[in-house]
Amino acid sequence: MAIRPNLFAFVALMLSSQAIGADWAQFRGGNQMSHVGASSAPVSWEKGTAPAWRTEIPGSGWSQPIVAQGKIFLTTAISETPDKPKGMMGGVMDPSTMGKPAMPKDPIQFAVICLDPKTGAIVWQKAVAEAIPTTGKHASNTYATETPCASSDTLYTYFGAIGRVAAMDFEGNIKWTQDFGPQPTNNQFGTGASLVLFEDALVVQRYNEQEGKLLCLNTTDGSTRWTAERSPGTSWATPIVWNNQGQQQVVAAGQGMVVGYDLKSGEEQWRLGGLDTSFSCSLVADEGGVYIGTSSPGSSAPICAVRAGQKGDLTLPKGAKSSDSVLWAKTKSGAGMPSPVLVQGLLYYFGNTITCYDAKTGEEKFRKRMPGGTLAAGCPLVIGDQILVVNERGTVVTLRSGGEYVDPQESEIAAEGEFFWATPAAMDHALLVRSSAALYCFGTP
């Protein structure tokens, strides 16, 4: 049920008079870098502020809500047996659950939900598949963690646990489906890598314990353009499309290795190996390079930067900190689960801490404990010169960008017993935040 209070007050930062387009059409936005641009979406609010609306979402899911053609879309997994995800301490950090997933006994509806941005009312709900998964997931994860994406006339969804990709119109009518099979994952944590849409190409990553495939599909019918294979190994990091000195490349991070492929042909252009752990967070890039942070829950891992324009095997010799191809590398720097953001030459990583680096040199500018007494799992957003991240308890932490640390603002979402692992999304004048139970809208939808 959607709840709309009579009075709504918030403190919004007016960043520019130029409005951005309303669409936020794939994971981390159209540019895949979490930059909202000029917006009057609220970045903080006073204690006790009510949302514009709150809508309970059936089932469970950590997919980011997207906004396309004046509608909100998200995915969810619905079963007769309640299966709300647990937080970090009740899930990932609980040793009794590691590698011991609770296998579902009831069929699950893998569904898409469309909501009205003004009221939060559910407009329609459509199941693209119904099945009992043959692979497990961790107590912290869901069977609907992959974020959908949208073009001007088509919505694309992916449920990695069963391997189904579906295309539908904005009324929920299915255009085509493709099935690639289930994905067994490391420690039975479950899946998480989202689709990537670039023009008429749809990229599907299937890095799991049985296979290592990256596929490029035609958006018109789901047929496969190319497949790039590598050794098996689970990755939860969503690929990015990077303009590498005029060539559009798909950069995919998997177990111990990052590889850049030509988007048109699927041919490998470069690879960086020697990265010892798996990937939970995705990459960021600019014209100067691509910035890599490996991450596993509870472990520290290397971060590094690959210079633009490189070809071949870029793997550093053991103990090396840089090369002609690698701008810099740091060991045991702990990227965390949220994907980083890049703002005016500065690289920000979030997790248990907030860490800022100079993107060109790797110099650490500051490292501070994450406010709110817990970590963040969802990715941050960049709104003007503000960086916003939601920790798992629902505290919205807003940091002003810059090499000098300034104590962040903290805004609370009153959500007793709910967890927040999904990445928030922005509309022109509103912020969308998903919890384990509901979707919240703050601002003026």
Map each language-model feature to its residues:
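N-terminal secretory signal peptides that target proteins for export/translocation
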Residues: M1-P5
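Noncatalytic, solvent-exposed loop/strand surfaces
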Residues: I20-P445
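Bacterial N-terminal signal peptides
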Residues: N6-Q18
